[in-house]
A protein has these predicted regions:
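Active-site helix-to-loop segments that bind/position phosphate- or nucleotide-bearing substrates
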Residues: 1-65, 70-154
């Protein structure tokens, strides 16, 4: 007997209902498994998406699901008495797109930035990317966490 399973998954698709609806779920499946490497236990999480708005939704989707991964790892740790660390997060999307109504904004802001900024520069105003320990990133994650908490309350 082991304290983990290979069967831990959540499926959002309802075959008898979703093919006929105008708004079927974009997130189709979440699969989790505890893996052991170098005598440490990690929670691996894979998600499979039917469709994803790359410009307006993907960031919060990734934030929310990696927060869920942390929560699940903590719950398993508490229930088993074994330390479970957050492991790899693998995100698979079949249709990753930008809606036409957002393309002008995407072109004017995002693509323009690609031509005018370095991939990484310590000066944030000259950089396309930031480190995850940057105060602005930490503040952004905290803001996202608050949005999720407020959404849960409503």
């Amino acid at each position: 007997q082991v304290f983990y399973t290979r069967r831990a998954q959540a499926i959002t698709w309802v075959p008898s209902y979703d093919p006929e609806t105008d708004d079927p779920p974009c997130l189709q499946r979440i699969w989790c498994r505890v893996i052991t490497e170098d005598n440490k236990n990690y929670l691996r999480m894979n998600t499979h998406w039917r469709s994803r708005d790359a410009y307006r939704a993907a960031y919060m989707n990734l934030f929310g699901l990696t927060e869920l991964q942390k929560y699940i790892a903590d719950e398993i740790s508490q229930r088993t008495g074994k330390e479970i660390l957050v492991g790899p997060y693998i995100d698979i999307t079949d249709s990753y797109h930008i809606y036409g109504s957002n393309f002008a904004d995407f072109k004017d802001r995002f693509l323009k930035m690609m031509d005018t900024r370095d991939f990484y520069n310590q000066d944030r105003l000259k950089s396309r990317t930031m480190r995850s320990d940057d105060p602005a990133v930490i503040a952004g994650f905290e803001y996202g966490r608050q949005l999720l908490e407020n959404e849960e309350k409503s």
